[in-house]
Amino acid sequence: MNFLDERWTAIPQGLDRANLYPYEAPRINFIINRGKIQKLPNKFKFDKRIPILAIGSNRSPSQLLRKFGKLEIIPVTNIIVNNFDVTYASLISYYGAVPATLWPVKGSKLQLSIIWLNESQLKVMHETEAVGKAYEFVKFDNEVINFKSSFIIKGNIFGYVSKFGALNFGSKVFEVRALSAIKAKKRMLKSINQQKALKFLSSKILNISSKKNIFDFRNKVISDKNYRFETIKKL
């Protein structure tokens, strides 16, 4: 793997920030070392770091660089999660993406990441995840995790789940959709990309799904905070 490839470090701007969500992430363990992406040393010491399950954009080096800048050290390791999938949340972000949340799905198995944060980094992450407003900070049961797939983890794993649950794609019965960008080893749900999720959401709110209306809808969500809050209430 080429850690110098700009796709890992280029931070999406403008509408790409929504279109490319949840961004690319290496499928091997790595470390962000003061702005550089490197292979994680085998003898890295995880002492006093808190394991946080990353289900969406937090898996991506570019998103971690956006949130923490180029002065921090953040190790990221792979992990297998059982009986859950990553679905679209019943939310829309301030930059116009339909974000992710974890949803229980019996039989599902997918590869996600653990980001190892110190106390000060965790405070920053809480702020970026809008804890208490958009997401809740939770502790996961150990049976969710396939520990054979991870670095040594002592104690619990924590993470963020949508305060508003998963987005309902059904008309008569409740249906959720997985993020196609998150690859599963075993997936039980239908999956769609970000563009289709946004098209559905704009159609649900506006009852129209032309490209122009989707574009206008997203721009209004980005520019008008109150409109975004009202939209979330309708989901």
Predicted segments, located by residue:
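Glycine-aromatic micro-motifs
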Residues: M1-L235
